[in-house]
Amino acid sequence: MTEQNIDIKRELKDESPIGQSPHLENDGRPSLMSRYSYSSIEEVSKEGYQWFKHQSVFLKFSLIVLLFSLMFSLTFGSLLGLISLALGFPSVGYRYVLLPILNALLNRLRLNSSGLK
């Protein structure tokens, strides 16, 4: 054990009225909450809020694109709506929307060219 761990345990035990600290894990290590002060948690939460505030514009835009794509696919046909969904969300749309559609179209062309229907 390092001296720092011993000092942390000693500080935690000194704060506890019974001598057993509620901030220790079962094996005697300091718990996650005891490692960080409340001021550092507050700073991290402020930074997270600032990050989310900047990201919320993107999130709102993504939701609008998703809703428009779903309405378009339900109203004007699945193929064009799913393509617009794929354009709005490329990583998800390419794997789960465009590839199956292209695969189905290619299979249809192969069947038609071979004379089978």
Curated annotation (Swiss-Prot):
The chain crosses the membrane at residues 63-83, 85-105. The keyword Transmembrane helix applies. Residues 1-31 are annotated as: Disordered. It comes from the Eukaryota. Keywords: Endoplasmic reticulum, Golgi apparatus, Membrane, Phosphoprotein, Transmembrane, Transmembrane helix. Residues 1-16 have a biased composition (Basic and acidic residues). This is Uncharacterized membrane protein C338.18. It comes from Schizosaccharomyces pombe (strain 972 / ATCC 24843) (Fission yeast). The lineage of its organism: Eukaryota, Fungi, Dikarya, Ascomycota, Taphrinomycotina.
